[in-house]
Amino acid sequence: MKKKLLALVCALALTFSFAGCTISTPDTVGSIGDFEITSGMYLLAQYGAYQQAAQLAGSDQDASDVKAFLKETITTDSDSGETAVVSDYVAQQTQQTLETLAAVDARFKALGGELTAEQLSTADRYAQQMMDQYGDTYTANGIGLETVKAYERLQVEHTALLDMVYGPDGETPV
């Protein structure tokens, strides 16, 4: 009887411990400096890197077979003949994209940059257009509207940063 009661208590405890468990993507996957990398932003950068690799694929390579394509070798520079394994190329390009976004955001903030309501609206409209056009693909890859908005806002920051640094009233006018 005691063993049955103990087994029941253990089963209930186990059941309750699993009740709150769900498998989900974490909100953030890391940071570069003060720049928090959301899971969506990481996935968007990775998706973009994979698409770049697909553009570099030879005619005999099938980028739609992801598992096989990641093991393939692509030519990354036709002039030098430099090659890379797709999985390595995607990892490197993903990292490079995230580092660039972090650097843009940090520099924009360091120079006191703030996006105007018009700039935010433009970025958000473009993000919605991107979701209207590619939403099924983005959603299937774990990328939502808020991620695309954040990415497009960073692109607007990038454009504004160029003017803040090199514009007529910039830090280093050209």
Predicted regions and their residues:
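Short, low-structural-confidence N-terminal segments
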Residues: 1-88, 92
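Peptidyl-prolyl cis-trans isomerase
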Residues: 34, 68-174
